[in-house]
Every structure is written in C-alpha cells, then in structure tokens.
Amino acid sequence: MYKETDVGFTIVWFSCVYSGAQGNPIIAIVPTFIFLLLHFSIVTDHLKQEIQLIIISIILGLVVDSSFSLLGFVKYNGTLDFAPNLAPLWIICMWAGFTAQINHVMKFLIGKYLLICFYGLLAPLAYIAGEGIGAAIVKDTYLSYGFISIAWSISLLSLFKISEYLMSK
C-alpha cells in the first residue's frame, strides 16, 4: 500500500504543479479526487480520522499558503481573480494529497518530532521545483525560504500531532 500511496501522491504533486503552471484547476482536481478515493477505499479501518485529518490539513494549507502570498513571499499562478492572495485550488489539492501519506508512507516519522521538523525545513525544495515548472514565483528568496521552512516545520509537526490524536480515538 505504501508504494501505491507514494506513486499516487507523486502523480498528484506533478498534476497540481502543472495545473498551477497552466492556470487550469481541473488538472489538479481530477487526479487528487481519484487519489483520495483510492486512499479512502484502503483506509477503511480509520476512514473517519483520515477524512478529519485531510479536512484540517486543507484548512491549514489554505491559511499557510495564503499567508505566504499575503506577505509577498510567493506569487502563485492559477489564483482566483477576485482573491489573488488566496492559495489556489492546486495548492489545496496538494495539501490534501500530501496529508494522505502521513499515516502510511510517512508513518516512520510518527513520534520523531525533531525529524518531522527537519523535513519541514526542506519544504523550500518543493517550492523551488514548483517555481521551475512555472507554478509560482518565490520573492525575496532568503527571507521567503526561511519563512517557508519555519512555517512548514510547524505545520508538519502540527499535522503529525493532530494525526496521533485522531488515530488514538
């Protein structure tokens, strides 16, 4: 199951970034929807908790990535005309797909809080890749990447702690 989840998220990630580069949200929505349906069909023993975690992640992602835009660190392609600082749909899809891996592909990180924070510090690598594909532009590079690293470390740690809480119910 881990291999399928990893491959599935890789497809979701590339679809989301390509969606941003093309400004077409359908390119992100369809693969993410299929991936999550397959994911939910596999995790039937803790389906409710997985859905709750992904919903929380979507809200967190909306806040975090919208903050990056509002603060002028990142300019995303594919945003809504009437809300240009709101994180675009393709970013939200990416958060949902990413979070589906926490209790599966990333299960080895559960309880390893320093390692989780370290992985969060590596988040700028994904933004660099997305920028290279044309999905976003990162401004004021050092400050932006520093802020992204810290925000992702906190976000990733929070998602793992929330997951631990939900899965213990």
Across the structure, where does each feature detected by a protein language model lie?
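Aromatic-rich, lipid-facing transmembrane alpha helices and their immediate juxtamembrane interface loops
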Residues: 1-169
